[in-house]
């Protein structure tokens, strides 16, 4: 479902190459020589390098020499185990069997060394991720009732000769399991060796079993589906198909805590609607701003994990209050998951649901802003999101301007623009995660132009509409072995938005790209978010509805 929506949404997105050309903030920042040059210190990826004062000091020195003006340090990773001295949150003590220094305070070290070097330091927290599938001990496991409740479909494959096997949906295949893909199947991930597949028609008849490996492009027949399996599961598929038996699918809806699902992502999300969760997250932000001289707070994963959450009783009550009536059929009035894996069937309350979830996130961000600014008004508030705005409703977020409307999107609820939260942030980092720096290069390579940093940056500006500063953000791993393309991607971010955020430090270090950064940032400059009065000027001077 999400892959199809992604392509549909993206195809509607990048239609105007000059989307950011009329940005008032871009022009002001150029005139004043302001540019966000931000590097992210991921907690887990850089654990060894940053687990001592010496390592931090050396890294900060290199950042200063590369003319970086802002460091974002991850102090509450997705595990919910923090890397500062907290009286509220549990501390990280080890990772992958490696002990973390008991009395070491990463945030204190980065703030001290960063400020010595004249670099602003912003503390990042993974807001609604409070646990990791690979590391126990996070608050999500201690407080199971905090976890998001995910709407699942328990499926099994049955045969006309009386056999039945449990079934995984897409995103596999898993060792020893059968997976099913619906009629909208396309490229299916990296398949393991000895993978067998059969195409099943609408009447249950199966094609001859065949083997496939690697990245396969498989299409299910109209009204039918594809079954895949490897090892024993693949052998069972072949044997059953060869026998002439027919396949059918059976299923029933199920509600599960996210830690109990087959979620391939590591993060265990807690419910953004839960008042106890909100109070806990706000207390962490309050603690950081009160105890540390941070220049900013950055909110990562301030969202739902996917479209299938949250279906808890807590959320149901709040949703019914939001729409002013009881939901007669839960969850089908919102949407129904199909028997054959594929797109959801939207119910009569689907658009209300999208607006409700986005409003929950906007309202929470308003609380965050009020909390942080009441302690220290000068602390900047940043947000990290994906740049694929037209499909970001999937995770319950509208990071655009409250004046940005896109009714041509078939999912867009009436008044959805009111849930946009760009006006509540001091800056937004949008992940422009594409391997092609420019539209032209994407087209030259036979790809659609939206698969470019340039297009993603322009659409980010289009959605935010100068409501706040926008920094195009790069995933450096996508440029491994291509420093020239990395440099061009940085230039696109600097040209189309008000700066560039680099994710992550570990790749700059591993690829030894400090010299590339010096090329991209030849002279020191200040960041736009260090001049917040520019936002007031931009917002107050903009015509209504612009």
Question: What would you call each of these model-derived segments?
Answer:
Residues 22-53, 477:
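Boundary/entry segment of secreted carbohydrate-active catalytic domains
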Residues 41-50, 88-104, 263-282, 347-362, ...:
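The substrate-binding groove and active-site-proximal loops of carbohydrate-active enzymes
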Residues 49-64, 277-288, 405-423, 453, ...:
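Short, acidic/polar
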Residues 54-81, 291-292, 418-430, 496-499:
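Catalytic domains of carbohydrate-active enzymes, especially glycoside hydrolases
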Residues 143, 149-172, 257-425, 430-436, ...:
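Polysaccharide-binding and catalytic clefts of secreted carbohydrate-active enzymes
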Residues 415-545:
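Substrate-binding cleft of secreted/luminal carbohydrate-active enzymes
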